[in-house]
Amino acid sequence: VVWNEKIFLNVADGDNLELWCLDRNNGQPLWKRFLSSGNHRERKQNMSSPSPVTDGRHVWVMTGTGFLRAFDFDGTEVWMRDIQADYGPFGLNWGYASSPLLYENALYVQVLHGMRTDDPSYLLRIDAAMGATVWRQERPTEALRESPDSYTTPALLQYDGVTEIVITGGDAVTGHDPETGQELWRADGLNP
């Protein structure tokens, strides 16, 4: 993600996952921060697939190993979460790759899985300043075989004064209330 003269990257460096802040003018690192160990390949991807997000003062980054961390623009860590420790292992066939969505001081993190787990898929709202979970909304699916898994990123939909968090995957598209997580609508049958 780029903000003014800074570029933020989620980087796999050997066994480690790191957040790099680069100078946009010359590509030189301004700082690097350790996120987690345990980088590995899941088929064709490593654990640095999710993109960082920023509001211009802070940067948040999720790893495929389940760590979600917040830093200020000087590289000082503000908070850290381990989503897998809190809610159970990710059960995706190809590894976790969804980026968080930042909207009005909240991060929306989706875990749509089912290939390697019987645990339900879910959407989280996390307070961006403190890192606490505000709510967790399960997202059921009737998807078969590999279809429960999704590597997409939540999207923001705004129309007629209404704001929704839209999730695609698990053979469905769903719209959710950003305040409560409640599913407002569902379009099924994406994988006949």
Q: Model segments located where?
A:
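Noncatalytic, solvent-exposed loop/strand surfaces
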Residues: 1-192
